[in-house]
């Protein structure tokens, strides 16, 4: 079964690059969102298996969005995980992937898919 993923980031260039990378590695990227409101709408409409959420969504917080999402959430950022250790521990996120290390294998491992 192919994993279905929604990616949430306020940077369109990153969204396009991440989609291309993950689709080349066999992930079905079912949607892209640049705001929390758009992400919530798309999650309900598309029912992805996992949602990748940027920690900093412009003026919005990816952690606040993670609390509102119903599915599996993995946080992403260009910044190091140690900067967000407390927030990550308190969030419902299944894990964290630095944007530079984003891959289908990392996503599948954190989402609990073998």
Q: Each predicted region: which residue ranges?
A:
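Hydrophobic/aromatic residues positioned on beta-strands within the core alpha/beta folds
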Residues: 76-77, 99
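Two-component/phosphorelay signaling modules centered on CheY-like receiver
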Residues: 12-31
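C-terminal output helix
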Residues: 83, 100-111
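As written
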Residues: 88-95
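The feature encodes the CheY-like receiver
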Residues: 58, 81
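Active-site residues of response regulator receiver
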Residues: 9, 54
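Acidic catalytic/metal-coordinating carboxylates
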Residues: 35-38, 61-64
């Amino acid at each position: 079964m192919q994993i279905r993923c929604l990616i949430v980031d306020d940077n369109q260039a990153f969204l396009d690059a991440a989609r291309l990378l993950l689709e080349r590695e066999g992930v079905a990227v079912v949607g892209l969102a640049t705001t929390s409101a758009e992400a919530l709408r798309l999650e309900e409409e598309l029912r992805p298996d996992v949602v990748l959420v940027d920690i900093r969504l412009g003026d919005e917080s990816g952690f606040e969005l993670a609390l509102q999402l119903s599915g599996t959430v993995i946080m992403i950022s260009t910044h190091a995980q140690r900067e967000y250790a407390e927030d990550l521990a308190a969030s419902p996120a299944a894990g964290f992937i630095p944007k530079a290390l984003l891959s289908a294998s990392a996503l599948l491992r954190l989402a609990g898919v073998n």
